């Protein structure tokens, strides 16, 4: 029996690269979609927010002399490319995917309309949210927090390269331990990197829990959805 009825899954663009240095690794995206399909078959409603770092990062663009807002818009377009790839892979895997963009590109993807997104979720379709919040200066983490709150998700699942939040960097400190659960205030007090401050504050204010887990661990998404000890739960 799943622990959640409706989830918001945040995938980083980098996660789609697999072992590649750039772009979308086919085997990686297929495996991720298989994990998502497994969860939807359990009756869980799934919405996804996808990043764009495998193609372009607005923050990086801003640091090399490009106007930050322009760089961020480029980053948003990168997320649309990822969302289309994800939606296409989902369709091929037998899922019904709907890509919705926060910026209008009507000939390519439909615009984000909240009641429509909710309807799709109720119908068992997977909704992929593209183009972040549609505004520059906001990360896709913030988009995940925002969309999670808007659709009434019970939890935001942040899929990363590490399998949770640690007391220190596990690569540098062999004594570092993984937290099973931690409060929002403890994360701030210990100065731990979970997600960017805006996204984090939004989740805290909305009492929307966050689960940090590794997307590269086979079956991790299913275990998280089943409420098993996987990753780190950040709660009020």
Swiss-Prot record:
SUPFAM superfamilies from the UniProt entry: Carbamate kinase-like
Pfam family, one: AA_kinase
Assigned EC number: 2.7.4.22
Alphabetized InterPro entries for the sequence: AceGlu_kinase-like_sf, Asp/Glu/Uridylate_kinase, Uridylate_kinase, Uridylate_kinase_bac
GO cellular component: cytosol
GO biological process, one term: 'de novo' CTP biosynthetic process
Location within or outside the cell: Cytoplasm
Family of the protein in this entry: Belongs to the UMP kinase family.
The protein's name in its UniProt record: Uridylate kinase
Species this protein is from: Polaromonas naphthalenivorans (strain CJ2)
Protein's gene: pyrH
């Amino acid at each position: 029996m799943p622990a959640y009825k409706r989830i918001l899954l945040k995938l980083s663009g980098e996660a789609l690269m697999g072992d590649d240095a750039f772009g979308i690794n086919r085997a990686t995206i297929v495996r991720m979609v298989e994990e998502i399909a497994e969860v939807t078959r359990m009756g869980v409603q799934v919405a996804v927010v996808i990043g764009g770092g495998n193609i372009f990062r607005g923050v990086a663009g801003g640091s090399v002399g490009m106007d930050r807002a322009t760089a961020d818009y480029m980053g948003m377009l990168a997320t649309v490319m990822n969302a289309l790839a994800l939606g296409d892979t989902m369709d091929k895997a037998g899922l019904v995917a709907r890509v919705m963009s926060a910026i209008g590109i009507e000939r390519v993807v439909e615009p984000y309309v909240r009641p429509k997104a909710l309807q799709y979720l109720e119908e068992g379709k997977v909704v992929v949210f593209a183009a972040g919040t549609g505004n520059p200066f906001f990360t896709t983490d913030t988009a995940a927090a925002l969309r999670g709150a808007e659709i009434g998700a019970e939890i935001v699942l942040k899929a990363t390269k590490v399998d949770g939040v640690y007391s220190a960097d596990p690569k540098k400190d062999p004594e570092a331990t993984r937290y099973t659960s931690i409060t929002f205030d403890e994360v701030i007090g210990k100065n731990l990197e979970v997600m960017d401050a805006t996204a984090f504050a939004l989740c805290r204010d909305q009492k929307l829990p966050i689960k940090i887990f590794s997307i590269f661990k086979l079956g991790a998404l299913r275990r998280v959805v089943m409420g098993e000890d996987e990753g780190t739960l950040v709660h009020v």
